Amino acid sequence: MKDKQFAIPKATAKRLSLYYRIFKRFHAEKIERANSKQIAEAIGIDSATVRRDFSYFGELGRRGFGYDVKKLMTFFADLLNDNSITNVMLVGIGNMGHALLHYRFHERNKMKIIMAFDLDDHPEVGTQTPDGIPIYGISQIKDKIKDTDVKTAILTVPSVKSQEVANLLVDAGVKGILSFSPVHLHLPKDVVVQYVDLTSELQTLLYFMRKED
């Protein structure tokens, strides 16, 4: 996410979508006001963290009144650009890629995978998913990005290919990449990269489980 108005710590930025999700849930449950303790309990953090996070955005609530749920839901929707559809592309249709292709992002948030890519000789190239997402060969990637003006990509290719494919995406105009590869990508500073390392997350979980024994 790129926002020129607010300069916030990375840890706070990572919680923005959680706050948005909670306020959407509160709104659906017809809760009109919520205090920092309620928000903290819903997310699993302490209320001081909530207040500190919110302080970066000015006056979002009033002491003794709490936070207006509808107002904050709208605020975070604007902040996360969730008021309009964001088109996304996926590169790599292995097991993880297939799982993501079948995940209906647009039914939960306003993000939509509109096309996918793999090696030109992949058997699924030239076909569509049951939801109508076309699958193209990697050699078409520049033309397709130019036609659709997609700026965001999900990368689910083997680690040994991740840098090569990421370079191709950046050359084609992509400005944001969500990478499922544990390999650190060396890209221009104006390209935003987020990493999802499932193995690392699982190892961290197991560490804390052993710590509790």
Curated annotation (Swiss-Prot):
Annotation: DNA-binding region: 18-57
Subcellular location(s) per record: Cytoplasm
GO biological process: one example: negative regulation of DNA-templated transcription
Top-level taxonomic group: Bacteria
PANTHER family referenced in this protein's UniProt entry, alphabetically: REDOX-SENSING TRANSCRIPTIONAL REPRESSOR REX (PTHR35786), REDOX-SENSING TRANSCRIPTIONAL REPRESSOR REX 1 (PTHR35786:SF1)
NCBIfam families in UniProt: PRK05472.1-1, PRK05472.1-3, PRK05472.1-5, PRK05472.2-3, PRK05472.2-4, PRK05472.2-5
Protein's name in the database: Redox-sensing transcriptional repressor Rex
Native species: Streptococcus pneumoniae serotype 2 (strain D39 / NCTC 7466)
GN (gene name): rex
